């Protein structure tokens, strides 16, 4: 058998009070931060994705669907010009 690395066992860690004091604060905080990030719309701004009301504009009502097998780059250029 190999020697001990000196680390605490997993069972010892999850049964300690210190573990639960730290994680009872950090885990809910992460969920709240994620919810605020999405609900305030900051996620749309950071990642540059369109908001739900911006997918279809007055000038662009069709679905950007590539139908040609041999000229997809031309169709992509046409779609990108409409943005």
Swiss-Prot record:
Topology with respect to the bilayer: Single-pass membrane protein
Subunit-structure text: Heterodimer of an alpha subunit and a beta subunit. PSII is composed of 1 copy each of membrane proteins PsbA, PsbB, PsbC, PsbD, PsbE, PsbF, PsbH, PsbI, PsbJ, PsbK, PsbL, PsbM, PsbT, PsbX, PsbY, PsbZ, Psb30/Ycf12, at least 3 peripheral proteins of the oxygen-evolving complex and a large number of cofactors. It forms dimeric complexes.
GO cellular component: chloroplast thylakoid membrane; photosystem II reaction center
Domain of life of the native organism: Eukaryota
PANTHER family assigned to the protein according to its UniProt record, in alphabetical order: CYTOCHROME B559 SUBUNIT ALPHA, CYTOCHROME B559 SUBUNIT BETA-RELATED
Cofactor entry: heme b
Cofactor binding description: With its partner (PsbF) binds heme. PSII binds additional chlorophylls, carotenoids and specific lipids.
Protein localization: Plastid, Chloroplast thylakoid membrane
Protein name: Cytochrome b559 subunit alpha
Residues at which heme binds: 23
